[in-house]
Swiss-Prot record:
Transmembrane segments: 5-25, 49-69
Membrane-topology descriptor: Multi-pass membrane protein
UniProt-listed InterPro entries: Cation_antiport_E
GO molecular function terms noted in the UniProt entry: monoatomic cation transmembrane transporter activity
Protein name: Uncharacterized protein MJ0953
Domain of life where this protein originates: Archaea
Protein's cellular compartments: Cell membrane
Keyword Membrane in record: yes
Length: 100
């Protein structure tokens, strides 16, 4: 089950990075940048899983984790434009499969 989680995680992460890269380029050209900070509560219980989630969000263009509160499973994420929780953490269920 963990191997499937790793494969799914990598596939979704690569897709998210590519889509976000295109989005950031478009927004940079059009000047449609409206930064904000969003607080996300994670479904991941494992501290290492939370760190991987934080890294994954930061590796995705247009997003940056600025704070991680592991005891509350919360992350504060800076984004260049308003977006849904699902758009920020599409790989979260796969990380949960790996670590929980």
């Amino acid at each position: 089950m963990r191997l499937l989680g790793v494969i799914g995680y990598l596939a979704v992460l690569i897709k998210a990075i590519c889509e976000s890269w295109v989005d950031v380029v478009k927004r940079s050209i059009n000047g449609e940048i409206h930064p904000q900070v969003i607080e996300i509560e994670s479904i991941i219980n494992n501290p290492t899983g939370l760190v991987l989630l934080s890294w994954s969000i930061t590796a995705t263009p247009g997003t940056l984790v600025i704070d991680l509160i592991p005891e509350e499973r919360k992350l504060k994420v800076a984004v260049i434009s308003p977006r849904s929780r699902e758009d920020i953490v599409p790989f979260e269920p796969y990380i949960k499969k790996i670590f929980d």
